[in-house]
Amino acid sequence: MKKILFLSVVMTVSCIQLHGQRGKMVQRYLERNLSKDAVPNTGPAPDYSNQFYWAASPYKHDTSDSIPTFLKDEKRDGRVDVFFIYPTSYLGAANESDILQPGGNRMEVFNKLKAVAWNADLRDTVVNNRSDNRSILYQASVFNAAGRIFAPRYRQANIKAFFVPASAEAAKAFDLAYSDIKNAFMYYLKYENHGKPIIIASHSQGSLHAIRLLQEFFDGTPLQKQLVCA
């Protein structure tokens, strides 16, 4: 297969924009409160030799294997691997409609998020099910025809990190999440890649981590020749 270098990263992060005087007051409130009341992160670091820590993997049946009936006869091109980084699914006690809808009760959401840990526990079945039955099912699965799909579970930053992205706590949360992605990718390179072309796919928070991954592993390195697109 001809290897094509096509570096085009689209980042769509679910940030909430706060405007006007009320927005500024809320922003100051968030910076004071979201950073000081969170409980410590819990849960183990992922062990990527264990299939539990992969939301999608060619070695188990998962929601990325879902294929529409009219495409079931299509053959996969096994010459390419897809490394997929899913978006934020760790919302804590918040309700998605309150977060995303203009008429949502934002202050109630903020109060619910104050005590939430900054990073997800990988044993949290609510978070895992949300990732599996949304992003992995409806996004990662579109790459079925391209080749094998690898999507690591990672200790993603809570949605509140996007409310105060400049805070030290949010930065630490994103760094921890990226460290898991990095370790997963290193495991994939060591045990699975074997010189295959690679597609890096991502969405929202996943794209933040994908950018760092591309910069660290592909920019100006021999691995860049294996990158099909990102």
Please annotate each region the language model reported.
Residues 210-218:
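Short glycine-enriched nucleophile-adjacent loop
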